[in-house]
Structure formats: C-alpha cells, structure tokens
Amino acid sequence: MQYRTLGRTGEKVSIVGLGGYHIGMQKDASESIRIIRTALDHGINFMDNCWDYNDGESEVRMGKALQNGYRQKAFLMTKIDGRDQKTAAQQIDESLKRLQTDHIDLLQFHEIIRLSDPEKILGPGGGMEAALAAKKAGKIRYIGFTGHKNPDVHLKMLHTAFARNFTFDAVQMPLNVMDAHFESFEKKVLPVLVEHKIGVLGMKSMGDSNILASKTVTPIECLHYAMSLPTSVVITGCDSMQILQQALNAAGSFRPMGQQEIAALLAKTAPAAQNGRYEPYKTTHDFDGTYQNPKWLGPGQSGATYPQA
C-alpha cells in the first residue's frame, strides 16, 4: 500500500480509502465487517463514513468492525449534516456512539451543495462552533467539508472560511475522468487546495458506476487517473470482497500516469462527458440526501440546492 500526507496535517493516509456508504448497503452485516477488517489488514487505513449513511447503519457496522484493536489501525473520517451549532453537536455525539470511539480523526460538513451553506455553517450559531468545541474537547482532530454539486459552492466555502481566518484541513469532491470536462472541481478547486496545503479527498472516481456505463474507461483507469492527481486519498465504495480486491489491485499497481497517458484518456472520455450526462450527482437531485431529507440539516432548513440556494 502506498501512503500520502494529508495536506498540512502530517498524517499518513492510504492512497485508496474505504467508502462508508456501500458498507451499510451490504445485506449481510458480518460481510461488511469482514470487508472493513480485510481492508485494514491490507493497509487501507482511511475509513470514510457519514452520520446519515443508511440511517446510521454504516457507522454502526464500522464501529463494530473497529473493535479488537482495529480502531488503532484506522484514520477515521465521518461527516455530519447539521448546519446549526445544536444539530451539529448532537450529530457528532451520535456518530461517536455508533462508531464506538472516543474521537474521530476527521470530521467533515457533508453535502456543501448550496451557496447559502457556508454562511450557515461558518456564521454565528453555525455548525462550525460545534466542530471547534468538539475539537477542543478531544472528540475530533481535524475539520473538513464535502460536496458534489458545483465547484463554485466549494470555492465559496473555502473563501468564506479564509475571510474568518480559518483553513480547512481537508476537502472532499468528485475527481474523475468526466469531471475534467464539465463543471470541473479538478480545474477550479484543486489548485486552491494545493496552494493552501489542504488535504485532497477524491471521490466518485467511477461516479457510482455511472462513468463505467459510458464504456469509455475501465475501473482501474478511473482509479489510476484520480490517484495521478495531487490527491491525498481516493475514496471508493466496496460492497463486496471482489470490489475491495479491485481497489487493492489498483493501489498495488499504481504508477503516476504520464501527461500523454492522461491526455489520451481525457480525449477518449470527452465526447461522453458533455453536459454531465455521466455525472448525475452534478445535474440531478438523485445524490442529494439533504435535498430529500432537509430535516437532517436542522430545524427550519431548506433542502433546495445550487443554483436555487
């Protein structure tokens, strides 16, 4: 397993991370635990999760898997939806309980997909107050955010934080062969993260299999492309031992792609990438959990997303 440094934190994280959503989808809970422990045994130390994944089942299963010494092997990340201080604090404590741990290595604000999100979180009474209090109490170590809708929303979150003299430790976003052509996080956001030494968490390397449906690239090409960017970790969902082995093979065989290889891959995917056809998380509400469940955001919050909010 290859390891990279997570931004300016100094933490060493595996080049591939285990996605938490798919862990809760597996019908057999014991199989989920086996996947998590096998990943850790093979050097994947970055564990992804979220307070809302599968009604908390993803965190519960990961919490069970991290017993018997496995917590010490993991760099554990989870996410919360709460935009206000009270909701965020409650979700942090619920995640800690489900994960059966006294601290989370990286806590991230989930689904930053509205232009109104940055002010709600970073303003007075916002969720950031809960995160900073949790950090002071030793419940969390680092703070980041995630989103999949539009790079301009990410930029607003970053610059709203900079204006308040706060720099996030990590940022998660789609980085893949299609993103490079449409509403690109790679082109707009990645340079800012590199400049400020913020950890880069790549997700949706295969677009939840949508990109594979374009029949232009293989799973290994997708993972190697994302790994060839200045990512700290490429997070991928594994709902079976077979898919986990695919991720391990990709990590084991990875060598940075040359400029000619990248150019050829992008040329191959360009026609299919137009209009975000294979990136529905950017163009539809299908991936917007907080749009469908605005109560997760906290009392009185709207689920409307970019560009409406």
Give the residues covered by each predicted segment.
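Glycine/proline-rich, positively charged
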Residues: 83-188, 194-201
